[in-house]
C-alpha cells in the first residue's frame, strides 16, 4: 500500500529534478514540446505573415540553376517589385547577398529595394579563430544593396539540437542587435524606443511556437509571384 502511494511521488520528483538539470531541461524542452505540440494539434497561423519559398520548382520555372548562389539578382528585383505592388508591409530576405553578380541585375535589385522602401536584408554572423580566442563579426551584404535597404540584421539559429525549438530575438554575442524577425517586428511598432526596450527586456532566445507541419504558415512559390502576382494579392496585402 505504501509502495503504491510513494511510487508516483518518486516518479514526479525524478522528473522535476531531471528537468532542473541543464541536460535534463534541454531534453525536456525538445521531447516535451514535441509531445505537447502533437497533443495540441495544429493551430491557425498568423494571417499577416507569408513565406516566399525558393524551391527547385521555382528554379526550373525561371530557367535558372538549382544552385542559388549561381543566380543573378534580376529575379529578386522582380519579386521585390511584385511584393511591393501587392502591398507587402515588410519584405525580409534571409538570403545573403554577398558578392557582385551580373552588374545590370545588381543595379536592378538595388533600385527595386530602394523603390520599395521596406526591405530588410540578412547580415551573416561569422566566427574567426585568433589563437585560442574566437572573434565574432557581422558581415554585411553587398554595399549597394545594403545602402538601398531599410536595414540589415542577422538570423541566428541554434547549431544544436538538429530540431530547432527556440529562436533568437537578439544576437547572443552582440548587445542591442535584434535578429531579422526582431527588427521586422520593431520597425512595425509606433513607439520604437518603447518597443526596443521591450525587445531588450526579453530573454535572448524564446521557445518556438509551432503552428503545425511544414507550410502551415501561408507559403507561396517564388516563381509564381513573378509569373502571376495578381493571383496572390489577398495573401500579400499587409503581410510581412
Residue map of PLM features:
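Non-transmembrane functional regions of envelope-associated proteins
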Residues: 2-207, 236-240
Amino acid at each position: 500500500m505504501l509502495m503504491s502511494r510513494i511510487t508516483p511521488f518518486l516518479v514526479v520528483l525524478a522528473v522535476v529534478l531531471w528537468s532542473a538539470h541543464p541536460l535534463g531541461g534541454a531534453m525536456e524542452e525538445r521531447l516535451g514540446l514535441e509531445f505537447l505540440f502533437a497533443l495540441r494539434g495544429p493551430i491557425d497561423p498568423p494571417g499577416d505573415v507569408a513565406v516566399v519559398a525558393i524551391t527547385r520548382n521555382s528554379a526550373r520555372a525561371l530557367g535558372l540553376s538549382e544552385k542559388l548562389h549561381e543566380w543573378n539578382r534580376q529575379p529578386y528585383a522582380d519579386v521585390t517589385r511584385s511584393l511591393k505592388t501587392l502591398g507587402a508591409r515588410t519584405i525580409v530576405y534571409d538570403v545573403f547577398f554577398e558578392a557582385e553578380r551580373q552588374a545590370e541585375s545588381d543595379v536592378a535589385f538595388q533600385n527595386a529595394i530602394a523603390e520599395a522602401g521596406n526591405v530588410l536584408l540578412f547580415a551573416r554572423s561569422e566566427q574567426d579563430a585568433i589563437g585560442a580566442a574566437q572573434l565574432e563579426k557581422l558581415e554585411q551584404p553587398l554595399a549597394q544593396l545594403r545602402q538601398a535597404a531599410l536595414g540589415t540584421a542577422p538570423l541566428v539559429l541554434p547549431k544544436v539540437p538538429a530540431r530547432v525549438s527556440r529562436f533568437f530575438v537578439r544576437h547572443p554575442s552582440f548587445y542591442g542587435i535584434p535578429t531579422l524577425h526582431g527588427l521586422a517586428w520593431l520597425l512595425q511598432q509606433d513607439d520604437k524606443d518603447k518597443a526596443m526596450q521591450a525587445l531588450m527586456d526579453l530573454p535572448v532566445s524564446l521557445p518556438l511556437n509551432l503552428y503545425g507541419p511544414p507550410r502551415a504558415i501561408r507559403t507561396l512559390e517564388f516563381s509564381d509571384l513573378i509569373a502571376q502576382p495578381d493571383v496572390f494579392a489577398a495573401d500579400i496585402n499587409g503581410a510581412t
